[in-house]
Structures are given as C-alpha cells and as structure tokens.
Amino acid sequence: MGKNIIEKIWDKHVVYQEEGKPDLLYIDLHLIHEVTSPQAFEGLRMNGRQVRRPDLSFATMDHNVPTKNLPTIHDPIARNQIETLAKNAEEFGVELAGMGHPDQGIVHVIGPELGLTQPGKTIVCGDSHTSTHGAFGAIAFGIGTSEVEHVLSTQTLWQNKPKTMEIRVEGELSVGVAAKDIILAIIAKFGIGVGTGYIVEFTGEAIHKLSMEERMTICNMSIEAGAKAGLISPDQITVDYIRGRKYAPQGEQFEEAANYWLSLASDEDATYDTVRIIHAEEIEPIITWGTNPSMGTGVSGHVPTLADYKDESDKAALQKALDYMGLEEGQPLTSIDIQHVFIGSCTNSRMSDLRAAANVIKGRKVHGDVTAIVVPGSYSTKKQAEAEGLDKIFIDAGFEWRESGCSMCLAMNDDVVPAGERCASTSNRNFEGRQGAGSRTHLVSPPMAAAAAIAGHFVDVREFVKETV
C-alpha cells in the first residue's frame, strides 16, 4: 500500500519512537519572531545552554513593528520585545532580518520568499499560522514558547502523530473566485473543528491549478479548520517557485533536491483516515458575517436566521454573534456597510494578492466613509510592488501604502479598528476584539476587500470583473 505525503515526511523525521508515547521529531527549520521567543531564550540563558543549530534557525520582527512613522515604536512592551529579539539573536548566533533589513517581513511570507521553506521539511514557529509553509509539501505547525525553547536546545520536539485527512477540491473555480474563498468555503461547509487531531492534505484539480502564493493562503488557514497542519504535495509549480531563491540549493544540488521533492507527492494508492470533498464550481466569493471563520457564506447570500438552526446551542451561538457584530437575522451580506479595509497579513499580502486587489481598484476611488490600508507582507514584496507601480494605483485610489508587518491582523501594534466599526479584512481570524476592542471583522479575499473599499459596503467583485473584461 502506498503512502501519503504526511506519512512520508513524518516517518523520515522520527528520531526516537516508543509504543504508546509521542514521537521525537527532528526539526529542519525553526522560524522565530519577537513575541513568543523572549522567554525561550531566557530559559537557555538560565540553564547555560546554547542554540543547538543556529544554522537551522531564522528570526524576524513582524507582529509589533509599526507600518508607518518608522522607526518609532510607542508601546513600551512592543519596543522591549523587538529590542530583546535583536539582543538574543546576536548573543545566540541566530540570523535576524530585523527592522530595516531587506529581508524583513512577516515570518510566513519571508520564509518562502527566501527559499528557506522547502518540500519535505519539518518546520516550526511560535505562531499558529506556521501551517502556511505546508503549501510547499512540508509538515509545518505552530508551537508554544516552552516548545520554542526545546527546539532551540535540541532541534527536536515530542509530538503525537496526528491522523491524516484528505480535503479534495474537485473541478475548476469560477471567474472572480479566489484561493481565500476556497478555504473559507471549506471551513464554512465542514466547520472549525473538522481538522482537529489531523494533518490535512489539500488535493484536487482546483488546488493544483493554484500558484504557490495561492496555495499558501489555503494552508495558512488550515489551522482555522482545527487542523494541526495543512499541506499540498509538491509539483513542478513548487519546484519552479523555489528555483534561484536565496537559501535554496543551487546548480546540481537543486536538481537533486527537486527530484527528491517531487518523490514526496502522495502515492496514487495512498489512503487517509478521513476524506472530505468539496466542488470548486459551487464556491462563490465568501464573506464571514460572524465571530469565527466558519460563520461565512457566499456574497449572494444573507446572514442566517434562528429558524435555520435546530440545535439550541447553535441558535445561542448565532444570537451571540449577531449581537456582537450588530447584524440582523436574514440581512443580505451586500447591505453591510464597512468603515475600514485591510489588505495584508500572512494570509493575503503577497504579490499576487496585491495585483488582484489593484486590478479592482485601478481607476476607481475609495468610498468617502472608508479608511483603507495596504500592508505588503515583506520589504521585498513592497519594493517589487512599487517597481510595478501598484503603490501608485492604491495611493491614487485613496489607500494608505504602508511598510511591511502583521499590522491590522491583530491588535498588537498601532493599526487597530475602533470599537463598533467594521473592517473588510484579508486576514485569517474574525474573533471578538481580534482587530481591536469591540472591532467587527469580516474576512474576505483581496479582490472582495478592494471592491468593498470602493462601494463602502460589500459587493460581488464578479460585477467588477465583468466591467473590466
């Protein structure tokens, strides 16, 4: 019987195994940022330890960094975390892309950009959206601060082997439907707990037609489906993306690596513990209306009603979400006004995301009641976008063009949504207070966010696509 890619990678990385106990896994790449690492480095210091493999560790600053008025950091906690990471990286010999460095950016954007992320690797970071790197055919997952210290000390991690799940996206996407819509549709259909206890492989025609950046969006939000990690088997699109990048193998070594990477793809007769199927043709642009990512529906739809649910706990959850979001039962999604638009985050801040949004925005103006910002995912992405003139398109339309960072995805820096106001956001979480105390978050794709910025309320971006054809 054949193996799926999850089994292939996991089995290759087991250092020690004992029946009834977690496996000890070797970790190929440890990504570090300023928020979850200070206590881990302090633990090393207190116990007289060093980083075992600084060459397999890479650090950057992203969560707390300001995206305007650089280099000022007003919050003392944020400033301390950034300064502490710089000191720790220097003391322990870890490479750092700090503020002002040409490689700086959101950790889950720069890993792939730099060629650090490669198929077959085990990748960890003290951040839940480490699953992003699974787009390359890697087992990548977030860890806690104590685990960060363990990896720094030993380059290994104790882990229970998860079950395996295939989520197959059959068919082809319709025009105007984005990768973000695929993953939001999956979560809306199967729920935020569907992946609990599993590593998920995304398969199917619709998945393998996606670019690498689009695949990253899919895997980024596998954690919102409850999964330990999500990944996609590598193919020629994967190989072509990695070729020539800064930390990728070069020359003959690259060709050898590429052959190995392609061999990792799940065998034709591979099996999974669970299989779920969704049809791409049924997916339309999605808008979340509630306070978790499963509370979403197609743009042509409406907010659910209590009558749509039989279970009393589901009715209570709906009512709680409606109260927080300030929405009415049965309200059409296109009737929801917004005050903010955020295009950015580790989910949707790459070049293809910015181009897609700019295509909608070009020649149009941001609605007078909307404050809109674009935050590229890395310094490199920002420079490339500026070379293509995307910054001018956004600025001319009325967007603010910012420096790279996590920004408005989470209320951990200067970019927050005021209480009671709504944001059409390309980020990954719409929990209560995620973008600021009392803020109301609606998750959408970059084109949908751009269209909402123009209209001042949610609209079907496919109407804009028709206008430009």
UniProtKB/Swiss-Prot annotation:
Enzyme Commission designation: 4.2.1.33
Domain of life assignment: Bacteria
Residues that coordinate or bind [4Fe-4S] cluster: C346, C406, C409
Alphabetically ordered keywords of this record: 4Fe-4S, Amino-acid biosynthesis, Branched-chain amino acid biosynthesis, Iron, Iron-sulfur, Leucine biosynthesis, Lyase, Metal-binding
Cofactor, how bound (note): Binds 1 [4Fe-4S] cluster per subunit.
Family recorded in the similarity comment: Belongs to the aconitase/IPM isomerase family. LeuC type 1 subfamily.
NCBIfam families, per the entry: leuC (TIGR00170), PRK05478.1 (NF004016), PRK12466.1 (NF009116)
UniProt-recorded name of the protein: 3-isopropylmalate dehydratase large subunit
Native organism: Lysinibacillus sphaericus (strain C3-41)
Gene name, Swiss-Prot/TrEMBL: leuC
